[in-house]
Amino acid sequence: GGDLLVNSVGYVALTAEQQTEMESRLAGEAPVACGPAGSISIAGSSTVLPLAEAWAETYQEACPDISVTVESGGSSSGAGRVCANSAKGTPVDIGDMSRDWKATEASRQANGFVLDCLVGDTTRDAAQFQVAIDGLSVVVKKGGAADTCVSGMGGVTPDQLRWMFSAETAAELTTAGLDMSEITPNGDGNDATHKWSELDASCPDAEIALAYPDAASGTYEYFFEAVLHEAEQGFRAGQQSSDDNVLVNTVTGDEAAVGYFGYAYYQENLATLTALPVKNSDGNFVAPDATTVRDGSYNPLSRPLFMNLLVDASTLEDTLPFMHFGLFTDAGQAK
């Protein structure tokens, strides 16, 4: 089977090597086509949500005796709920995450993919499966002033993204090792404003409005680490939401706005959004697409997406066939 279902909801499918690794994690279980009659509960990352929903719909068509419920809530919710951390909600069988586990949430066993919960029910373990690759997309309104601006520049650098999104002053960025003359060659020296014209004289004299996920999101955390380098000042004020559609609407409603979210939501809105090319580690401006996300050239914003299965014999009777169905069968891959 192909990778059409993964691609159809806006993700990039695993490489052959990654698929082989995931298959080895299922080894010895010889999953049947459908698990025993019952239910599967899934919650977590809003980025993984479209894929989880697509797999659930397809699996229930093939296995009508299985009921699959899917909720969002963010990666922290996915980690917490599969570990039965009541502060994050009711326990689930599968926790979705668009980031890796934190050392405060779980400890990794020697095999590398089973994790012991450290918060919630500490007798619980979770098995981590990579299900797709995401290219975190930095977007502006297609054809708008910001689009024209960045197009003329060829793209943006990670340091420019840090200046745009961070609450750090120019002096603090300089102390952190950034060259402000390269970031804002037309800078106005005013830390209270962040204008497109500071990036290039040909760009509009308009304040850069921000749209980004809330702090419970793995997407927020990934960008915070990869672009802001966990700067203690955090993000500048902007439109924050756990609903990616709110972020899309914010960006499409303001030519001077810039936002970021998972590749799936960019793919859903290609008619109204442009994803900015970002300078990678080789010095090339690269936009996210199926090829650049998969081969890693869209760095530093390519990242793995995960589903984490509760390690419990009765639960795994249903969740392992579901995972095998999603990752390896024609029906799961080619809706």
Model-derived segments and their meaning:
Residues G1-K335:
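Flexible loop/hinge segments at secondary-structure junctions
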